[in-house]
Amino acid sequence: MLNAKRQFDKNEDCGILFGSQISDERIRINSISDSCCDKTSALKCSCHLDAEKANKLIAEEFNKSNQTRVYIGEWHTHPEDYPSPSTQDLKSLKESYNKNQLAIPYFILMAIIGRKSICFKMYDGHVFSSIKPSITSNNK
């Protein structure tokens, strides 16, 4: 899903991560949105969500999934092979945590998509953590 969003010779892009809680310790990323980027402000090293478009996509995904898929965070691209979050990325993640009503409380996720790898960061209201997601099939 996220690999298809890699940035090669263009501006950064961004969108929404949708997921569901499958246990106290596990969150599943069910799907990702198409771009929700405000194209008028996108640069090679910067992008901003179009809040109106993002909110519309969040509502559509929630309704389409019989209220099981919710906003769990955001994805964006970086023009580098092995991405790491910038100071602005961490500030943005913290702001999103503080201003959004989170359906799954106490965390928000950010996926930073580089050309060769993806960096996942989580914020729990106090600490930023790197996470390594595990990939499972739908049959388990």
Q: Which sequence ranges carry the predicted segments?
A:
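Conserved beta-strand-loop surface patch within small alpha/beta domains used
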Residues: 1-71, 79-140
